[in-house]
């Protein structure tokens, strides 16, 4: 069983906030697949269903962001799940709007919802961070995070949520890099490029393969004999 927890704040006042992109992501998955209607349990809104043949619980904590771990932790204890059975989806200030990153474990990065999850659920769960961009100055962060998405944001927000919902079964199959590539391509970016070769495999710095070939195949000139005498007459000795 896998729990997919979207983080956010409950109530209509916060529904369109950037801080609630985790709720929006889980709602998109719920709409796209055959999940039960939302119900209340574990201090949260929950819905049950299947993705990729595995049972999945969608959860939106109703405790407010700072106490998200209370709800998710209660659900994990009820189902006897481990941190590896949890995916948390939440907003990330330090990623450009529309970018996504998915990894296991790590720090909370100042995110209070993740601080709470770390305390109640352990740290080795998968974290899907969805970029909302940074306003540029620290003083504007709170208004930015708790502000609603602008209409212009739909240009990246809709394809991001649609692609995540369409490919949510990849979360079940642990196809994390493939999912990130699909999201990047949907947003007009590039898939992850091939990793650079190891130093031992690289060509010598500053030399093309042609130059290397020349260096390795230079002919040896005769030092004595008639040919050497002729070359000396034509070109002279080096250093003269």
From Swiss-Prot:
Enzyme Commission number(s): 3.1.1.29
Residue ranges, annotated region (Disordered): 190-240
GO biological-process terms attached to the record: protein quality control for misfolded or incompletely synthesized proteins; rescue of stalled ribosome
UniProt KW keywords: Cytoplasm, Hydrolase, RNA-binding, tRNA-binding
Residues involved in tRNA binding: 14, 64, 66, 112
Main localization (coarse): cytoplasm
Marked site (Discriminates between blocked and unblocked aminoacyl-tRNA) residue numbers: 9
Polar residues: bias regions: 209-219
Reaction(s) catalysed (UniProt annotation): an N-acyl-L-alpha-aminoacyl-tRNA + H2O = an N-acyl-L-amino acid + a tRNA + H(+)
Ranges of Basic and acidic residues composition bias in the record: 190-204
GO terms for cellular component: cytoplasm
UniProt cross-references to Pfam families, sorted A to Z: Pept_tRNA_hydro
Record's subcellular location: Cytoplasm
A GO molecular-function descriptor: peptidyl-tRNA hydrolase activity
The protein's enzyme class: hydrolase
Residue(s) at site: Stabilizes the basic form of H active site to accept a proton: 91
Catalytic machinery residues: 19 (proton acceptor)
Record-linked InterPro entries: Pept_tRNA_hydro (IPR001328), Pept_tRNA_hydro_CS (IPR018171), Pept_tRNA_hydro_sf (IPR036416)
Function: Hydrolyzes ribosome-free peptidyl-tRNAs (with 1 or more amino acids incorporated), which drop off the ribosome during protein synthesis, or as a result of ribosome stalling. Catalyzes the release of premature peptidyl moieties from peptidyl-tRNA molecules trapped in stalled 50S ribosomal subunits, and thus maintains levels of free tRNAs and 50S ribosomes.
Assembly: Monomer.
Family: Belongs to the PTH family.
Name of the protein in its database record: Peptidyl-tRNA hydrolase
């Amino acid at each position: 069983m896998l729990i997919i927890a979207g983080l956010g704040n409950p109530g209509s006042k916060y529904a369109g906030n950037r801080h609630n992109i985790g709720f929006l992501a889980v709602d998109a998955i719920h709409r796209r697949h055959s999940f039960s209607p939302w119900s209340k349990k574990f201090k949260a809104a929950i819905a049950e269903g299947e993705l990729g043949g595995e049972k999945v619980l969608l959860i939106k904590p109703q405790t407010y962001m700072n106490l998200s771990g209370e709800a998710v932790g209660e659900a994990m204890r009820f189902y006897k799940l481990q941190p590896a059975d949890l995916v948390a989806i939440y907003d990330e200030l330090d990623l450009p709007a529309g970018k996504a990153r998915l990894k296991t474990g790590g720090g909370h990065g100042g995110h209070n919802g993740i601080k709470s999850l770390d305390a109640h659920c352990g740290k080795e769960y998968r974290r899907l961070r969805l970029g909302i961009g940074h306003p540029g100055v620290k003083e504007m962060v709170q208004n930015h995070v708790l502000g609603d998405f602008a209409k212009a944001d739909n240009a990246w927000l809709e394809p991001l949520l649609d692609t995540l919902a369409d490919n949510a079964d990849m979360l079940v199959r642990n196809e994390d890099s493939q999912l990130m590539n699909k999201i990047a391509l949907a947003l007009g970016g590039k898939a992850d490029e091939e990793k650079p070769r190891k130093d031992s495999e690289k060509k010598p710095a500053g030399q093309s393969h042609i130059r290397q070939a020349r260096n390795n195949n230079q002919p040896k000139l005769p030092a004595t004999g008639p040919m050497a005498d002729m070359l000396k007459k034509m070109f002279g000795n080096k250093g003269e």
